[in-house]
Amino acid sequence: MVQSERYLIYIDKYIFIGKYKGKKNMFCVFTQAQEYDEDAKLWFKLGTIYLNNDKILSVKNVKGLKEYKKIIFP
């Protein structure tokens, strides 16, 4: 289970990005267990991305994120 601020960006049906508390350039990529329970508040961490001026520096342990070439953060 991942604790994160409610700074979520919807990428596709089940994949979101959330900001780590207190970490400026570090975001975690995770999925919600909607396929099991629509009301579930369970999140499974898929990996971490590191940003600098909204440019992705590196992606660690994120499967299926290669097709998302540009991720815009509010």
Language-model features, listed with the residues they occupy:
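Conserved RNA-binding domains used in RNP assembly and mRNA/RNA metabolism
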Residues: M1-P74
